[in-house]
């Protein structure tokens, strides 16, 4: 079994430190005090240009529950496109129904 070491980072300095310490990939987010939200596009671009390991980007439009209204899901779809265009190797996202189950319809989009 191969173990993949992922560093959760919120800045270019943290990304460099994780990469230099041997991480296999990064999860790039912002504001860990609220369990993370989507970072700005400029940060994603800077990390992708400076770091040689894959950077996965959290797409979470707001703190709080992972239950999203249809308009929030649509906005997150656009954010996914923006993060991929900025060079993200992958996307980290989650969504739940109001019953607490995985919102497969939202995640398929």
Regions found by a protein language model. Give the residues of each.
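Conserved, mostly hydrophobic/aromatic
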Residues: 18, 47, 83
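Ordered, amphipathic secondary-structure segments that act as subunit-interaction surfaces
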Residues: 78-102
């Amino acid at each position: 079994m191969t173990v993949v070491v992922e560093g959760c980072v919120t800045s270019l300095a943290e990304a460099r430190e994780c990469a230099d310490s041997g991480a296999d990939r990064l999860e790039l987010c912002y504001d860990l005090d609220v369990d993370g939200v989507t970072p700005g596009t400029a940060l994603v671009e800077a990390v992708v240009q400076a770091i040689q390991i894959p950077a996965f980007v959290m797409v979470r439009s707001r703190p709080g529950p992972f239950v999203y209204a249809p308009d929030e899901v649509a906005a997150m779809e656009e954010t996914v496109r923006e993060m991929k265009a900025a060079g993200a190797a992958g996307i980290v996202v989650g969504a739940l129904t109001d019953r607490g189950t995985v919102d497969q319809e939202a995640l398929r989009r």
